[in-house]
Amino acid sequence: LPISFYLNLIVSGGFVEENINDENNFRNLIWERIICLKDKCKKYGVLQSDVRKTVERIVFERASRFVVGVDSDIVDSDILEALKSEGIIVESRNKIRLKYDIFEDICFERYIDKAFDACHGSYNVFFDEIEKIGRCIYRRYQIWISNKLFVQEAREKFVYTLLTDNSIEAKWKKQTEIGIVKSKYCGLFFKEFQELLDETVVEELLDITNLYAFEAKINHSPALIMNVTPIGAARENLIGMVFEERISLDKNRTSIIKLCDDYANCFYKTADTEEKAYKIIIRYIDELIEKSKEEKSYYQHDEEIVQLFLIVAKMAKSSKSWLKEFVENMIVEYCSGTSRRDSVAEEILKAVVKKCPLLFAMELPELACKSAETLWGQRVSRKHFRYDGYDHNNVRAYGLSDNANHFDNNENGVYNNTFFWYVMRCDFV
């Protein structure tokens, strides 16, 4: 299990010898044994059914009213003492709530499960029922959908139907899509249904992934920063479908580029998907270079070519051979004296030096240094004219170029420049 919180509960809750089949099964055990005090009710002289009703009341009232906690007076004193003693709720200034968000999520899952079973396939009745709680139900519904992808029966009878049934309200269809793409288990869904998903549905899932398949984490070191991290397995599956041209690469160009860029930022990547992602981006790079040659000018496209190059550079493990050949060609073009109008070489070399991604520097350190040397050294073919002005800093005397003289390294020095940092950190010199 990847969640340390679960591991702690397995040990502290006495689940070490339990036959836990999957996360859903374990969450059911958490609900019965920990949250509802199944084995400890007798100790406090309370009924488990009363504990369950109390927990549900605390959770639903707090969520529907969007408050930090609910009044402790609404809870029976014996049940309140039991829940506090077992670490299920916390109290502050006579306000109580469940101690962990995950406890509340499990409570909502149980509620949604019951409403779903009671609807007997009338999904709009199901949605009307759970919507009575208020807007707070949307996020919990997404979590419920994410976990339902475990169960094959649920995928066949429910999730696929929600995506294709036109009688389902648009807002619930959207919430279903969000739940799918945020799930780490949605690969099971794509594997079974990708042949049945038409281009429109795939495009919708692509856009939803780009908008919602992230989680925010607060980082307190060295300053307070919120990091937004891509999550879920949707990108991996969608990239495979894009690579097979299940949707138009031209029509969905912006969305596909973002999809691949976000995948490049994922902590866990597979070699196969990474290779597909960078090859998709290379196709766009080649198209822009050809377009620039036809227009006889790179000015209109150089910024976009550089951005696409940096996406590929983030996936340097898979794209190493292409990056080496591409940057070497840029170095040759730059040294040949080709003007900036006729080549994007200078912009690519500047990107390597000023925005060098970690993996590029780690996989191709010599090429990174060679790019800097080429950019900062004088070109043999470069002629100096009177209007170039006096060489105040003697850069030309030292064999350096204007790029070296005007290189913006601001007040933070090596700590604000990735290339310098990697050179210093990794002993490239």
Mark where each language-model region is.
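A short, conserved structural fragment
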Residues: 84-94
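The conserved phosphate-sensing helix
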Residues: 1-12
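Residues that cap or delimit alpha-helices
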Residues: 1-2, 23, 76, 169, ...
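Winged-helix-like regulatory helical subdomains adjacent to P-loop NTPase cores
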Residues: 13-77, 92-97, 101, 114
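Basic, glycine-/proline-tolerant helical and adjacent loop/strand elements
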Residues: 100, 105, 109
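Extended amphipathic alpha-helical scaffold segments
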Residues: 67, 92, 113-429
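Type-3 copper protein
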Residues: 80-81
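Intrinsic-disorder/low-complexity, polar/charged segments
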Residues: 3-5, 19-25, 118, 182, ...
